Each structure stands twice: as C-alpha cells, then as structure tokens.
C-alpha cells in the first residue's frame, strides 16, 4: 500500500527521510523534548540533505520535489519526532513559500539560498492574541515613514520563533480598507524592535519553539514589503493548501509511529497465556488503526498530486488535514490503551505521540475551519 503509484524518485526520497528519522531523530526525540529544543546539529544535517528546501527550485539553492515526495518526507520525519516534523513542514510551507511565490528577485537572492540550506530558518507571524482563525482582525500596524516601515504590535503562537532568522510579518497598512489593508513584510529577526517575549510551555511538540513576539517600533526598509501593498491576507491564505498538506502528513507520521509501537507491544506482551495481539479486542483495534492510517495517506497523496499538477485543491487539502489530524488523536489514544498502564508512563513513547498529535487539529486552521472550507466548496459541487 505504501508504495502504490509512487515513482522511483518519490520512493528514494521517502526512504532517505525514513532512514534519517530512524537513525538521527527518533533516538534523541525524548531528550530534545526535555530540553525544549531540537539540536542545532540535527537541523544543519536536515539542511544538508535538502529537507529544508523541498519547495524551493534548484536555481535558488533548493532541492525542489513534487508535493507527493514532500508529504512522504514530512511523514517520515514526523514519525521520528513530531516536533522535528513541525519545524520542517512550517519552514518549508510558510517560511520558504511566501518568499518564493511573492518575493522580488532581490528578495529571493537575499533569502532563498539560506532558507533552502537551513542556514536561516523562517517563521510566520500572522496570529495575534485576539486574532486566530479570524486572521483579518489584526491590530499590528505598519506605517511608512521617510522610506522605512515602522511596525508595532504583538504576535502569538509563532512556530520557530526563537530559532528563526527571517520572519514573515503581517500588519495593517491601510486601516480603512479592512481585509484589503493588510500587507506582508520580510523582517530579519535581528532587527531592533523585534522581540521574542517568551517561549511557550506546551502540551506537545515541546522541542519545537513556539513563541510570543512583540514588534516595538521595528523599522525595516521600504523594499522589505513582500508582494503588493494590501495583498497580505491573500499571501497568507495562498500558503494554506501546501501548509495543510504538510500538517496532515505530520499527523500521519505521528500516528504511524504510535501504531508501530502498539503493534510491537501487542506482539510481545503476553496475557492469559498468549500475546495480546491474539485477543480479538486488541486485534480489532490494530486493524482499525491500520485502516485509518491508510485512508489518511490516500487523502494526503490525492491532495498532494493535485497541488503538484497546479490544480485547485483547497477542499482536498482541508479534507486531508481534517481526517489525518482527528485520526491521529484516535490512533494515539488506542496505542496508549493497548499499552495499558505502561502507555501512561513517560518510559514508553506513546504518551508523547498522543500529546504531539493534538496540535494538528489546531494549527494551520482548526478542525472547525476545515469543515467550513469543505462545506463552502460543496455549494458548487456537482452531484
């Protein structure tokens, strides 16, 4: 099933990511979680392997692959560690993506080679304390003064915020224009006035740095406007298809790791004189888990193929993310149940998988937003 309709290149990329995750990531995931930080050396290795520039063409220093290969790679890295999968997916989709798709030639030359190699990690500063799913309700302001943009405001839930060297910041430039008054900016994180207030203490993916950011008279050149003035919301929304495919793949990877742990445990654990996998209730749970994983993968690969072909896939990406993220919570919960009391202990990895999976129903658009997107698309659905 896993190899169905995959090209040789896609299989090669998947297997490379799998070997790397099993050898270099999974053995250290627990330690990184306790430290609250993914090892810098590991991130550098990811850059060397091309995992951080998968959406960037070779002319800009990337290792551009199709979205099927990208999704497969994110799944494998996330199976090794959900936090590392988050770093990879978010950096590719909303760190590299906006610069590639909307940057000027000069902006691309300045940033894409470093982003693609992992020498610079990107972050996405859209969400605010009062503006989550209602992304257009921003209070951060950017004013053009003497040829420079001066930005003031606060951003919340910034993934890669502490590690990033480049922030994609969204701010209101024309308050009277509503949604059309939001613009996007490239802000180097060493700019005076760009302040990482704190790193959040989270339920899961703890090694992924999630930060609150304040912009206090943060001043950048006029040329750091990304795309056209007033097109910021369009820029943010245009990354949703690829971003949601990535998060769906992250959820799938975490869930698959939980399933594999539960399967191994069920084969070894003996109760009532036989391995618990031979008890029908446990066997049925594993069968359901396996089926749900395969169903999620098919949805993800379908959306990824549409994205690669340049076809609209907003609904398909939302379906993939919605199903995969909710499936992941169920599969991880079942993995804990199969482990019994041991599943509740930190000595076993399944409790971490459960905590890591939960975020996938929230970021890059909550489950409720995904259902809204899917339902909206049904208005034009031909029966």
Predicted regions located by residue number:
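Flexible, small-/acidic-enriched active-site or ligand-binding loops
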Residues: 137, 190-221
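Short Ser/Thr-interspersed hydrophobic loop/turn segments at strand-loop and sheet-helix junctions
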Residues: 50, 74-78, 171, 187-192, ...
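Short Gly/Pro-enriched turn/cap motifs at secondary-structure boundaries
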Residues: 88, 115, 130-133, 157-160, ...
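A short core secondary-structure module
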Residues: 148, 152-196
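Long, acidic (Asp/Glu-rich), low-complexity accessory segments flanking structured domains
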Residues: 217-235
